[in-house]
Amino acid sequence: VVQKDRRTALGIAAAAAGLAAAGVSEGVSAPEVRRHTAEIENLPPALEGFEFVQLSDLHASALLTEPWSRAVVERVNALRPKLILITGDFVDGTVERRERDVAPFADLRAEYGVWGCEGNHEHYGDYEAWMRKIEALGIRVLRNAHTVLEVKNPEGKSAQLCLAGLCDPMAARFGREMPNLEKTFAGAPASREALRILMAHQPKFFPKYCAQASFALQLSGHTHGGQIWGMDEAVAIINGGFVRGFYRRSGALMYVHPGTGLWNGFPIRLGAASEIALIRLTRKQP
């Protein structure tokens, strides 16, 4: 009986080790491109079929180093996106230690630029140093701010896209600027005049933001898509019920990105793959 129990224990240990190894391997692999369609109410005709890339939770670290970052950039640029949006958690570590690992992101290319918002992890390190470094890479971080892009379709018709980014609520712990939708959209074109896209790292505040401002699409990350199959319920509890994919509230749509990278403090993915999201806009039918 003792021998049988020992064999059983060894078998369980071996299976657990195998799953852990598979999870780490999946977690650190270069993410695949996944295509999604966002159905937007009252989408301007000139933006029908407009595609952009969303990255999130890159978490450049001692685990996800320069070769991984380079692979992500190559896959994104191969899509020739019109626009690249990065919804926070760029890095883990100091600028000095991670400078080489984030360097490839300077090579991201898109006709209408590369834009981002901060995540909670930016606040754990030298926040201002990282904001300067990310901007130096050519990624314009919108902190309670917006910009207006004049987007043209292949037929030459144009429409305004109002792109906004919120500060992250983690700022409260460090006495930094909190998310402020009123400030973010101050002076912005009305939602009937421009398509408003809001970048906000944490998805759980989506209903609150919908009540405070008018926008068509919110892009978030943070949850890593649950990271392990079967953890959806636990992840949903601490994230307002949002885990990954599309959600609709009050006429607005949100996409929760499952993450392009992952945090090196828990470097395992099983059944919740990372991704490079290629999102196509289309008008929602009545």
Which role fits each region the language model picked out?
Residues L43-P286:
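Soluble catalytic domains of enzymes that build or remodel membrane lipids, polysaccharides, and related
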Residues A16-A20:
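Hydrophobic core of alpha-helical transmembrane segments in multi-pass integral membrane proteins
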Residues V2-A15:
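N-terminal secretory signal peptides and thylakoid transit peptides that target proteins
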Residues G11, A21-F50, L63-P67, E74:
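C-terminal segment of N-terminal export signals and the immediately downstream linker at the start
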